[in-house]
Amino acid sequence: MSSCPFAEVDKIGEMLHFRKGCDADIGRIMELVADAQHWFAKQNIDQWQDGYPTREIISSDIIGSINYIVELNGIVVATAVISFDGEPTYSVIRGRGWLNENRYAVVHRIAVADKCRRKGIAKEILYYAEELCRERGVADIRIDTHCDNVAMRSLLKKMGYTHCGRITLTSGAFREAYHKEVK
């Protein structure tokens, strides 16, 4: 994609269309993942540099109906996972601890097209996750990110997420863990 399919706009959220991912989206999702991997590498962030997430993981997300696609003017510009099935690696947290032990949504694998970065799309994904929580009667969202992913950590703070400590992934890597009580 040569450019993001919109110029500077004030109401980006009103222009985005969210839908569940399908098998036909896997190629584009992998392009978005490659964009994110490249961006992380340029920022010297050791996140997604080991081939994660794989095509198999993305396919599993789609089969599990937890992958979401973000379209703008019919073009896929972002993807994310929003799940209500918990996260095993969140069972042990070092630091402050989770705000509560309520049922929660978890957001994973946010990837935005390079040309659409810094347009507020990741923020809209998190708003969408909050809306899904409200629809399902779930009052909490948890998310984790790499300690060097300053952009995501800053966004989470601005959006009212509380830093709760560190979790350990199955790979042994640490991630900074955040929690928000949805109103």
Can you annotate each of these PLM segments?
Residues 66-80:
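Conserved beta-hairpin
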Residues 117, 143-153, 171:
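Conserved beta-strand-loop-alpha-helix junction that forms the acyl-donor binding cleft
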Residues 81-109, 117:
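Conserved acyl-donor/pantetheine-binding loop and adjacent beta-alpha core of acyl/acetyltransferases
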Residues 112, 118-131, 154, 158:
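Conserved acetyl-CoA-binding loop-helix of GNAT-fold acetyltransferases
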Residues 126, 133-145:
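Conserved GNAT acetyl-CoA-binding A-motif
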